[in-house]
Amino acid sequence: AVEKINQANIKTVVLQSGEENFEEAFICDLIIKIKKINPQMAVTLSLGEQNYKNLQNWKNAGADRYLLRIESSTKNHYEYLHHKRNIETRLECLKNLQELKYQTGSGIMTGLPKQNIKMIVDDILFFNENKFQMLGIGPFIPHHQTEFANQPKGTAKLALKTIIATRILNPYALIPATTALGSLDKDYRSQALLCGANVLMPNFTPQQQKSQYEIYPNKKCINENFTKTSQNTFSELEKLAKDANMVLDFSRGDALN
């Protein structure tokens, strides 16, 4: 998959998974192999909460960025969403990432159960205070195998308004037009770009494995196929950008803040 990304002249790759008990050396090996394919390629990890030693070893192996959403900066709400966890651990992990000089990303879902507007405002202020380089914002979409299965999904309107407010306070941040915004009743990613998002994220995971990572139903990227590079590979992404009066940029996209 990374070789396909490199062939497509993309200079950044994200390795994402659930919070597994990874062998630290396995991730190090992946990072080293990616850097051998292209030493200039930025490697972003999204592997959940990890201890300081793992984060340090992955940084030393060549990782450049790390994504770890706060989900809610309100303590009681965070611990309602994440049973048997406390927000202090998440905050410590974010602090460790910044200390280790990762370009650090965080973010939230909008429309979460028991979330209110004040919480979202506090989250936006939390982003601003911590000067994160990347901020992911998308609507909550319930999965039928979770305790929130019967909760209503978040709206595109609330997610887009949150992106606008976040962009105003964080003018240099990388803000993706998230896959979740493309997975509602229609594709809202162009609207997200118009509201302040500036990143699109094609999924190069092989089709067979991609279908096993259904974190919410009807995930947009499940049916997108970027495994064969051709001049039409990015036609959909080019259209999304064009609809927002933008053009695609395939550089590393290093943060400006």
Label each residue range with its predicted role.
Residues 60-64, 84-86, 123-124, 153-154, ...:
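Short, hinge-like loop/turn segments at secondary-structure boundaries
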